[in-house]
Amino acid sequence: MKYLLDLILLLPLLIVFCIESFIKRLIPKKKKSVAGEIVLITGAGHGIGRLTAYEFAKLNTKLVLWDINKNGIEETAAKCRKLGAQVHPFVVDCSQREEIYSAVRKVKEEVGDVSILVNNAGVVYTADLFATQDPQIEKTFEVNVLAHFWTTKAFLPAMMKNNHGHVVTVASAAGHTVVPFLLAYCSSKFAAVGFHRALTDELAALGCTGVRTSCLCPNFINTGFIKNPSTNLGPTLEPEEVVEHLMHGILTNQKMIFVPGSIALLTVLERVFPERFLDVLKRRINVKFDAVVGYKDK
């Protein structure tokens, strides 16, 4: 009874905060300056990571770029230098914890303390559970979520000491709603979203108000990781569009960045609608892609 009474007493606050949130959405947010910041981006040799590096290069930042692909990271670095940025590329396998820690030491010695960390590196395997090999499952979690722990543990202390910084988690819409034949990927992205949310609350509990967090959750992106993805939610997203939303979210300290915005509505529907209706809804959304190993379409 006391719990119910407490909830009723909180209703006026809920109404006030809802109105406040609505008004804030109508007012354009001022973008913060990131000039002079040291920005580290993992998975910067291609796709979202590469384009994010280009955008930060235009903003007078110092870039630290990581990728497992030497040619890819050098190409990104060359373009960023043409855009006027100081760039430090490193070949790093984000599935290897000790390799990450070794690179961290080099970054601190050669460049300095990272103040904006973009955990972007990711892998995906399209297969049913039984066709997904054990090493593939392990690598999915090592890159898609465990690497976030190792990099954040390494660079967050300096941000907390200065009460200034930003940790960016590149997750996925698959971190909120599941897709068949992406079991390992969805599980790892749910973990990445959980990492972001728990880190956000932990920083708040510690009083680190100057250390910001953001989490990107896009729908399918045309980067070649998944072959011919399609959904009735709309066309496959182009990387440039996603990065535009990501940069706006970072520069305005947005905590959760959904692309498209309708993904946010889906996450709410999954929690309140009956399961049978959700089954019908998922059939209407009709997520499809090629090259599913182990599954035979009947």
Swiss-Prot record:
Pfam families: adh_short (PF00106). Substrate binds at S172. One of its GO terms (cellular component) is lipid droplet. GO terms for biological process: androgen catabolic process; steroid biosynthetic process. The keyword NADP applies. NADP(+) binds at residues 40-64. Keywords: Endoplasmic reticulum, Lipid biosynthesis, Lipid droplet, Lipid metabolism, NADP, Oxidoreductase, Signal, Steroid biosynthesis. Residues 1-21 form the signal peptide. Can convert androstan-3-alpha,17-beta-diol (3-alpha-diol) to androsterone in vitro, suggesting that it may participate in androgen metabolism during steroidogenesis. May act by metabolizing compounds that stimulate steroid synthesis and/or by generating metabolites that inhibit it. Has no activity toward DHEA (dehydroepiandrosterone), or A-dione (4-androste-3,17-dione), and only a slight activity toward testosterone to A-dione. Belongs to the short-chain dehydrogenases/reductases (SDR) family. 17-beta-HSD 3 subfamily. This is Estradiol 17-beta-dehydrogenase 11. The gene is Hsd17b11.
